[in-house]
Swiss-Prot record:
It comes from Mus musculus (Mouse). This is Zinc finger and BTB domain-containing protein 45. Belongs to the krueppel C2H2-type zinc-finger protein family. A zinc finger (C2H2-type) spans 412-434, 440-462, 468-490, 495-517. The gene is Zbtb45. May be involved in transcriptional regulation. In the central nervous system, may play a role in glial cell differentiation. It comes from the Eukaryota.
Length: 520
């Protein structure tokens, strides 16, 4: 019987990667490229086997025998070029502002891995960072009576064994945490000769002050407060940071006095001595008036605690606007990702009581003063327009309002339905309704649209990005209209049915219910 022949397995770790790198080098050199990808006016050469393996869009085109593939012009050519390079290299660098364009291009080419990654990038960027739950404050023990305080301190001071002067700093015999005090930091004087001393803020107050953006003068004042640390200028902060708002600040002025006479209590060195000095220790560690001063510490005067003033209102919403200046609208994006409920509307600019100011310079040609008024501009009297002005208005030229009252707004009139528009962009969009032209086509389902904006909104149905979130229940939707319908469920007012008592969130739903309701 013949011996079993040995079998050797040869496995190269990075063979696939090196093969793609070789193909990418051939593509850059223009060797063996058998397909052309065109996007707008740009074009690039590639290998059909790589494109078909990485993109179902290219695979469907190549199965039909196309040697030249034209990508729908919904995204820039540079974005498509990046995705083609991704098919060769497997790596893609996406900036935060370009994630939406890359997502749209990947949806057209149906590259699912890029769609998933860009969806996560957009979701992380659009969702507001939920603040971490604030840590629970440490339990504050109930205030003790003066006699109990004296007994507690005597017990702590007597816990030190005799004959060990440095036992408080020993690692084997540790004293309570409040008696192991580090050396006080070097005093830092407040900046400037006119800086007023103030008490050191508590750690939690210091954290709240750091969250607010203040001016340079206020920042310098906070640095002075952090360095001052005591009631006097240039004085070292108290040795007990946990007791900064407690009993040490009530008798900090007595820290400069001489040490009291010995009362039989074991003398401590270093921080322990400063601790006993700062509280003015006698035979009774704390006087009877100590408790009232402790409780009144939180209700300090306006000089001891700086009062934070609220930030001034936004300059875009405060004060009247000059006549003729339009309120800036929301930022325009490829997909309008507006999370939560919409913001408050901008206030209406007040009408000036004096004479109307001169209208701002316009870039539209001056027309006859008796031009036909627009129904959407708010005029009540109609002045007969000249034939030349009517012909100009029908052709889409701006029409001015009669008279010189207020700012002159241009208007465009549709020659088919006589509808007027205040901007050329809206007028151009409206003309697609009458022409029936739909030049923008979805590369996934081949549905056509008259405007590129409609195509971009339609692409959300393929990408699955739920960019619109309810501010009440955090539910997400793909379209703004779906969010608006959902917001009706959170309205406090309800429309009850008089017959069966069923409530509805909208009166239209109630009317539909009443129409289908059986007659009594």
């Amino acid at each position: 019987m013949a011996a079993t022949e040995a079998v050797h397995h040869i496995h190269l770790q990075n063979f696939s990667r090196s093969l793609l790198e070789t193909l990418n080098g051939q593509r850059l050199g223009g060797h063996f490229c058998d397909v052309t990808v065109r996007i707008r006016e740009a074009s690039l050469r590639a290998h059909r086997c790589v494109l078909a393996a990485g993109s179902p869009f290219f695979q469907d085109k190549l199965l039909l025998g196309h040697s030249e593939i034209r990508v729908p012009p919904v995204v820039p050519a540079q974005t498509v070029r990046q995705l083609v390079e991704f098919l060769y290299s497997g790596s893609l660098v996406v900036a935060q502002g370009e994630a939406l364009q890359v997502l749209t291009a990947a949806s057209v080419l149906r590259i699912q891995t890029v769609i998933d990654e860009c969806t996560q990038i957009i979701a992380r960027a659009r969702v507001p960072n939920t603040p971490a739950p604030a840590p629970l404050p440490p339990p504050v023990p109930p205030p003790l009576a003066p006699a109990q305080l004296r007994h507690r301190l005597r017990h702590l001071l007597a816990a030190r064994p005799p004959g060990h002067p440095n036992a408080a700093h020993s690692r084997k015999q540790r004293q309570p945490a409040r008696l192991q005090l580090p050396a006080p930091p070097a005093p830092i004087k407040a900046e400037g000769p006119d800086a007023e001393p103030a008490l050191t803020a508590a750690p939690e107050d210091r954290g709240e002050e750091d969250d607010d953006e203040e001016t340079d003068e206020e920042t310098d004042a906070e640095e002075g407060e952090g360095g001052g640390g005591g009631p006097g200028e240039g004085q070292a902060p108290p040795a007990f940071p946990d007791c900064a708002g407690g009993f040490l600040t009530t008798a900090a002025d007595s820290a400069r006095e001489d040490p009291p006479a010995s009362t039989g209590i074991t003398d401590y060195g270093g921080a322990g001595r400063d601790f006993l000095r700062g509280t003015g220790v006698t035979e009774d560690v704390f006087p009877d008036s100590y408790v009232s001063a402790w409780h009144e510490e939180s209700s300090g005067g306006p000089e001891s605690c700086p009062v934070e003033t609220s930030a001034p209102p936004d300059c875009a919403l405060a004060g009247p606007r000059p006549t003729g200046v339009k309120t800036p609208g929301p930022p325009v994006a490829l997909f309008p990702f507006h999370l939560g409920a919409p913001g408050p509307p901008a206030p209406t600019p007040p009408t000036p009581s004096g004479p109307a100011p001169a209208p701002p310079p316009t870039f539209y040609p001056t027309l006859q003063p008796d031009a036909a008024p627009s129904a959407q501009l708010g005029e009540t009297q109609a002045v007969p327009a000249a034939p030349a002005a009517q012909a100009t208005a029908i052709s889409g030229t701006p029409v001015r309002a009669p008279g010189g009252q207020g700012a002159e707004q241009p208007a465009y009139e549709c020659s088919h339905c006589r509808k007027t528009f205040s901007s050329r962009k809206n007028y151009t969009k409206h003309m697609f309704i009458h022409s029936g032209e739909k030049p923008h086509q979805c590369a996934v389902c081949w549905r056509s649209f008259s405007l590129r904006d409609y195509l971009l909104k339609h692409m959300v149905t393929h990408t699955g990005v739920r960019a619109f979130q309810c501010a009440v229940c955090a539910k997400r939707f793909t379209q703004k209209s779906s969010l608006n319908v959902h917001m009706r469920t959170h309205r406090p007012e309800r429309a009850p049915c008089p017959a069966c008592g069923k409530v509805f969130s909208h009166r239209a739903l109630l009317e539909r219910h009443l129409a289908a309701h059986p007659a009594p």
